[in-house]
Amino acid sequence: MSDLVRSPARAVMVLGTSSGAGKSWLATALCRWYARQGLKVAPFKAQNMSNNARVVPGLIGADGAQPMGEIGSAQYFQALAARCVPGVMHNPVLLKPEADTRSQVVVLGEVRRDLAEVPWRERSEALWPHARAALQQLMAHNDVVVIEGAGSPAEINLHASDYVNMRTALAAQAACLVITDIDRGGAFAHLYGTHQLLPADERALIRGFVLNRFRGDAALLAPGPEQLQALTGVPTIGVLPMWREHGLPEEDGLYEPGGHTAAPGHAAQRLRIAIVAYPRISNLDEFQPLRNLPGVQLVWARQPADLERADWVILPGSKHSQADLAWLRAQRLDAAIARHAAAGGALLGICGGLQMLGEALIDLHGVEGGFDALGGNGPGLGLLPLVTQFDPHKLLRPTRASFGATHGVWAALAGVAFDGYEIHNGRSIQHPAMASALPALRSTCGDTIGWQNGSVLGVYTHGLFESPAVLQALFGAGCRTLDSVFDGLADFAERHFSLGALAGLLSPKQPPG
């Protein structure tokens, strides 16, 4: 069967010379730019590897039921930028790393445990039909599909089984851009090398090069772009200045050199928030609004000293709560966290972080077993009187939740309602033999999904800091709307691409001459 997707839709694909080159944010900008032209737009990434995920509607089953599924956060935001409803078709395969050599495999929103142990090359061939079918559906029902690649398309040791980059590009006959991070150095060599390592039929799809994170006078680039075009036949159609404050979460987290990031333009920090950066941290994108707040400093805590001057400490989500809890103890962060709580410092656990704050974690089914010889039953930090039991069934749901009568350092949250989402296997209950904790957060279904014990608060719901109501209650400040972020990205791309370049990508490639 031919891989070619036959459709009147046009596809624009963003490739990169490496991970972190800027593919995700540029794809998001293109989604909004094309949507603003009155076109029906959808994002697509055949396979994403990330523990940053969002809950979206899954496929409708034969019984008419529509379960919830999960996709990478980048494609979730790209769908919103495209003004379409995020769904599993936008990211048909999601790999969620659980250990250095193992990932949970999510196909069309559902966990496929049978594929977790399959060797990479064999698994890629099994997954490609799902990705191709999703791409075909999107191209059949949209005017433009904006596709994001992964890593580099020119990894010659992986190329034969790489369906995320050029196999997808060929199937969609996409107009491809290649973006590189010029701030790292070697940009022209990276672009030329990427181009030359691709077979001729794949090189023919490349319509433009993009230099990202450029500092200084663009005139200093000459004659580099002209010489590169003479060598490859591909023009450089965008030179994008360094821009840190675009407001979109980074695909792989918020890490910055020096271990912290401060709100831009505010030298005097009023509130220091330490987020424990364990190895299998997940859903980091939900902290982006904190990064944007004036007067807030985020610290990524990896050692006890990082917590010493913290006003707040946050234990974020985790893809493997017990392994990350063991790491936390090995770093002696457990004692530092306990001291912070004993001193009345605000301590927040979200999802996996909530589980770690409890008295015990019980894994009778081996849900978290088999990774790094960890799993089974183990003690928590003992700061919330809860017991968590892991269940093979993963709970995926969007959640409308309301805080009850929170008190102390969390009193401002009392009565605040917000929309979030849940992605977890564990179920936590308050053990009747233990000290009581105040049920602090309930879903509209009536479930208790948050507890408070003194200055310690644990919630299962992600998305707390993405709520304007929560930010107003806690910080007396609002946040930029996502729409304004997406429009800002589109405006930025429009200013820094060659005149007519973005619209020109939707036109058939003109033969040389």
From Swiss-Prot:
This is Cobyric acid synthase. One of its GO terms (molecular function) is ABC-type vitamin B12 transporter activity. Catalyzes amidations at positions B, D, E, and G on adenosylcobyrinic A,C-diamide. NH(2) groups are provided by glutamine, and one molecule of ATP is hydrogenolyzed for each amidation. The keyword Glycoprotein does not apply. Belongs to the CobB/CobQ family. CobQ subfamily. The active site is at C351, H462. The keyword Electron transport does not apply. One of its GO terms (biological process) is cobalamin biosynthetic process. Gene3D superfamilies: 3.40.50.880, P-loop containing nucleotide triphosphate hydrolases. It comes from the Bacteria. Pathway: Cofactor biosynthesis; adenosylcobalamin biosynthesis. Residues 270-470 form the GATase cobBQ-type domain. SUPFAM superfamilies: Class I glutamine amidotransferase-like, P-loop containing nucleoside triphosphate hydrolases. Disulfide bonds: none annotated. Keywords: Cobalamin biosynthesis, Glutamine amidotransferase. Pfam families: CbiA, GATase_3.
